[in-house]
């Protein structure tokens, strides 16, 4: 976490409560990025594989729930800028999904090529998160009131739970 991130957290803290969708998204982002970094930094192919198996469903559930409850809300309610943010989010998730699928097809988690894929995943994920926690969080604050963001947070958690249960069943 950069100094700028820490300052932003401190400034947002008074306006973000535990059920605000931005707080929930930030928690998910932190968890996913940490798993991805641990996976990339691991020297063990077996550990990379285990971390990847943990990361993939976490990202899938988060992404689908975020698309359904956050991006779609931005598309339906906000300005052109908010809609652009949502469209970019969908594209970013698609790129991450494609990379995750490519990594899932490779069984050689100990290889330099797989580690290169993991590094690119970390970089893409970090950039995607940075954009969301900047532009998207700002759009959410401007376009939705506290009650709407809390309701969005509840719907996000419910959707994420449904997506996680689907992933387990598959």
Where are these regions (language model features)?
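Small-residue-biased structural context
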Residues: 1-170
């Amino acid at each position: 976490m950069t100094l700028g991130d820490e300052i932003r957290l401190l400034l947002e803290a008074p306006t973000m409560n535990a059920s605000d969708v931005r707080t929930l998204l930030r928690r998910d982002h932190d968890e996913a990025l940490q798993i991805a970094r641990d996976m990339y930094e691991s020297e063990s192919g077996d550990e990379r594989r285990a971390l990847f198996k943990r990361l993939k469903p976490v990202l899938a559930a988060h992404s689908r729930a975020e698309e359904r409850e956050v991006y779609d809300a931005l598309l339906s309610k906000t300005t052109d800028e908010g809609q652009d943010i949502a469209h970019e989010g969908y594209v970013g998730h698609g790129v991450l999904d494609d990379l995750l699928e490519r990594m899932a097809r490779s069984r050689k988690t100990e290889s330099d090529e797989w580690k290169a894929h993991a590094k690119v995943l970390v970089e893409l994920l970090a950039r995607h998160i940075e954009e969301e926690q900047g532009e998207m969080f700002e759009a959410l604050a401007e376009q939705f009131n506290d009650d709407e963001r809390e309701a969005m947070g509840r719907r996000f958690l419910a959707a994420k739970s449904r997506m996680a249960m689907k992933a387990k069943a598959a």
